Amino acid sequence: MYSSLLSIACGAVLGAWLRWFVGLKFNSTFQNFPLGTILVNLVGGFIIGFAIALFANMQLSSNYKLFVITGFCGALTTFSTFSAEVIDLLQQQKYGFAIALITIHLMGSLLCTVLGLLSYQWLSQH
């Protein structure tokens, strides 16, 4: 039990630090488009897709899965920030930006998760 908690906590610390750093570096790039939030959600989608395939095909301690998926990806990706940014755009009546942001986050994250799965499959065959 304690090793599981420690695995999640260590992954979460690294994921949160990376999310903070990427947001700090990229969220001010475009005025109406929070690029940092988009990047962490897309990268997190890719990592989780790759990790799901990896853990399904390797016999590893469940602590690795807890570290990567629950801890790291859970802290790296951010649905609440995405939601707040969309609401902010809607309140400013920037409907086109809000729809674009929703589309990029949802479709992009799904696509990146599939790409993560396919990347693992490709790498495991070569």
Swiss-Prot record:
Activity regulation comment: Na(+) is not transported, but it plays an essential structural role and its presence is essential for fluoride channel function.
Annotated membrane topology: Multi-pass membrane protein
A Gene Ontology term for the protein's cellular component: plasma membrane
UniProt-recorded Gene Ontology molecular function terms: fluoride channel activity; metal ion binding
Catalytic activity: fluoride(in) = fluoride(out)
Keyword ATP-binding: no
Residues engaged in binding Na(+): G74, T77
Localisation: Cell inner membrane
Pfam families listed in its UniProt record: CRCB
Transmembrane segment boundaries: 4-24, 35-55, 67-87, 97-117
Function, as annotated: Fluoride-specific ion channel. Important for reducing fluoride concentration in the cell, thus reducing its toxicity.
Family the entry assigns: Belongs to the fluoride channel Fluc/FEX (TC 1.A.43) family.
Record PANTHER family: FLUORIDE EXPORT PROTEIN 1-RELATED
Name of the protein this chain belongs to: Fluoride-specific ion channel FluC
Organism: Acinetobacter baylyi (strain ATCC 33305 / BD413 / ADP1)
Lineage summary: Bacteria, Pseudomonadati, Pseudomonadota, Gammaproteobacteria, Moraxellales
Name of the gene this protein is made from: fluC
